[in-house]
């Protein structure tokens, strides 16, 4: 699964306008609604924010992966929000989250997001990529970083 197949420019909010965790989740859901992927956001927003109370999506190191299933989703869908200031997502390391990757899966494949998040996490572990994502000023820069990383990964796989 390629990240660039899901994270196109219209799926990247940079900068995210939200100042709170709840606002960030709503802003990301609204973007999916704007793209005609979702017809409504209020129930999903309530479900995700309720889930966050018991199972925070913050993974530490400045990133959060909120996720939920929806009957409106046929396949994995996602949107990435980037906050220069960072948002409090109750991260285990206490750091604010600068990258919020919201994923939605179909109810038939509720765990379909795991491969995608794992791939994103591997990419984010690369210090150059992480720095580039955090310093980017336009969604196009983000998609270029993702494409370059995936191209490099493909070359590495060919050499192995």
Q: Where do the model's predicted regions map?
A:
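Cytosolic covalent-transfer regions centered on His/Cys nucleophiles
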Residues: 1-160
